Amino acid sequence: MKHLAMIIFLITSLYSREANCTDMFGLIFNKNLSDAETAKYIKYCIDDLGCDANMTIEIPDLSIRSNLLEYAYDTNKTKTFDTLLAKGTAANASLATSIGMSFAFFFRENGVGIDNKEASPELLEFIKTQKYKEFKEEKFKLIKKLLEHGQDPKDYKVLKIILKIINEEKDLENLLKDGAKKELVQ
């Protein structure tokens, strides 16, 4: 079934470039496509159809413009994410906000959410666990990669607020400072 859908997609690409460029968002969210397949089709759209790697979708009710990189992050398609970075897709403030909010969601999923802008004793214990340390390390590696690709360190306001609540903002400040220094050296 997914091969039929891709054949239809490729055939229609011959007739309507604009329609297929916006289809890149649908490709990313397509659960029937593996990450590797999605990355391949995204690369095809950008390289062969001439689609803009920095295209966005305006969400009027939220007054934000989500881009392909944010969609790849939200669907956890890391190969697609890396392909988009390599094709020059800019990391925007909306993506940084999503990364920040993923910390809040992670805490809530583990039964230790932030309430009234304060960390509960359970949350302060949870951040000592290996599970949290691995999550944080994974997100910080991602942030470092985004900084290396030109993301503005100032975009991480939401994450700073969340980490300040659990007294871990210094780690982020150091990462953002080091990432900005590397960018200036280049």
Q: What are these language model-derived features?
A:
Residues 35-46, 76-85, 113, 120, ...:
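Ankyrin repeat structural motif
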